[in-house]
């Protein structure tokens, strides 16, 4: 179905506005009706991939763009022609802004990359953004930090977020936060030491279907949630699991919570399956490499006692519209954290997601034995 056509659910969401839509979805958002006298100044930081920059880091260009009021679509076509259609049809289409985007009280003021030339195109596409020559320079003029990492390994995360955390600035640190369990714990403990609100998670946490799933779980209407199966459509490789395996694990963590006991993973060619076990809950499943008829990136199945609930990121058949929605919810939650200084994601969940990913890799390396999470937690 063409999202530009009449879509009942989309029209319903649009007709009630962002606040009404989010109320229907069972989530809350800090109101944006009365902009602050001084807009929140956001500094974006781009992580590297093994020391190499990410010139069109989608976790900044796509995810964070709603935090800035202005986008020059002509400049976008010049610098990012591949993404022009997504921006014009969805991300910067006033018909699909959830009566909220771009936020009236936020501005991206600086873009930092270890290679300053990489930041220049972003400043031309989003007028008003400056190239930060150093983190120290950027931190003098921002109220919060967004560190985006689309495909990196996380080994540079601490160095990129620590200066802002040391100043107590609310910070988003992308996955895979810190790279390994020790790196994740180091960032979490540093943030806590400096009383700096920290957010780290997967955008899967904010899919429209996930919000419905959480509402079903919390209502108790369909009985106990007995099993979650979270699937990633892309073909599997072990290096890919270390980065993108975070997503299905985050789906399980979002629905079932922390307290994981052990993990076992098996692979066959370009697919893998991992079982995540709890001492007091039913085991759950992740699948990296599910075949698909239509690419929608992922699918999650919830098995309640009385109901099976299945969802993908798509809304009314449109992946791009659903992708737009989950990014909106992600940055809306970040904005709310900046305003309230209340962390939206428990630190234990963040730590256990990293541990699960690494325990699964350890399981695979050791003939797919069951690996206790304690073995990798240190």
Please report, for each region that a protein language model flagged, where it lies by residue.
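C-terminal segment of N-terminal export signals and the immediately downstream linker at the start
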Residues: 27-46, 51
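N-terminal export signals
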Residues: 4, 11-32
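C-terminal helical cap and adjacent loop that interface with cofactors, partners, or active-site loops
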Residues: 314-378
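A contiguous active-site-proximal alpha/beta segment in oxidoreductase catalytic domains
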Residues: 177-238
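Beta-strand-loop-alpha-helix segment that lines the small-molecule cofactor/substrate pocket
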Residues: 142-145, 151-202
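NAD(P)-binding Rossmann-fold cofactor-contacting core
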Residues: 70-122
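Rossmann-like dinucleotide-binding domain that binds NAD(P)(H)
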Residues: 229-295, 348-355
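Short acidic low-complexity segments
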Residues: 97-101, 130-141
């Amino acid at each position: 179905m063409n999202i530009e056509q009449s879509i009942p659910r989309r029209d319903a969401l649009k007709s009630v506005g962002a606040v009404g839509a989010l109320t229907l979805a069972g989530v809350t958002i800090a109101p944006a009706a009365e902009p602050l006298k001084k807009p929140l100044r956001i500094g974006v930081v781009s992580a590297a991939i093994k020391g190499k920059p990410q010139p069109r880091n989608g976790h900044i260009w796509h995810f964070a763009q709603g935090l800035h009021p202005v986008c020059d679509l002509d400049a976008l076509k010049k610098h990012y022609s591949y993404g022009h259609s997504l921006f014009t049809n969805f991300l910067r289409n006033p018909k699909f802004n959830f009566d909220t985007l771009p936020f009236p009280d936020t501005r991206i003021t600086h873009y930092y990359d270890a290679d300053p030339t990489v930041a220049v195109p972003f400043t031309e596409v989003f007028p008003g953004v400056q190239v930060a020559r150093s983190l120290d320079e950027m931190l003098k003029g921002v109220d919060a930090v967004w560190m985006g990492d689309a495909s990196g390994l996380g080994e540079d995360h601490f160095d990129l977020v620590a200066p802002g955390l040391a100043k107590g600035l609310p910070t988003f640190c992308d996955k895979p936060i810190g790279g390994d369990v020790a790196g994740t714990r180091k960032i979490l403990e540093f943030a806590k030491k400096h009383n700096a609100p920290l957010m780290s998670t997967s955008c899967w946490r904010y899919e429209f279907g996930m919000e419905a799933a959480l509402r079903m779980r919390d209502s108790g209407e369909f009985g106990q949630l007995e099993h979650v199966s979270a699937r990633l459509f892309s073909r599997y490789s072990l290096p890919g699991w270390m980065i993108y395996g975070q997503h299905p694990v985050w789906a399980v963590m979002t629905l079932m919570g922390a307290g994981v006991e052990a993990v076992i993973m098996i692979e066959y060619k370009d697919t893998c399956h991992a079982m995540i076990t709890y001492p007091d809950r039913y085991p759950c499943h992740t699948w990296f490499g599910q075949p698909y008829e239509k690419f929608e990136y992922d699918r999650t199945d919830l098995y309640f006692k009385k109901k099976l609930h299945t969802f993908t990121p798509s809304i009314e058949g449109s992946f791009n519209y659903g992708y737009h929605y989950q990014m909106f919810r992600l940055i809306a939650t970040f904005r709310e954290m900046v305003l309230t200084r209340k962390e939206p994601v428990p630190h234990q969940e963040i730590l256990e997601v990293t541990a699960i990913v690494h325990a699964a890799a350890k399981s695979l390396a050791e003939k797919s034995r069951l690996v206790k999470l304690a073995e990798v937690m240190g």
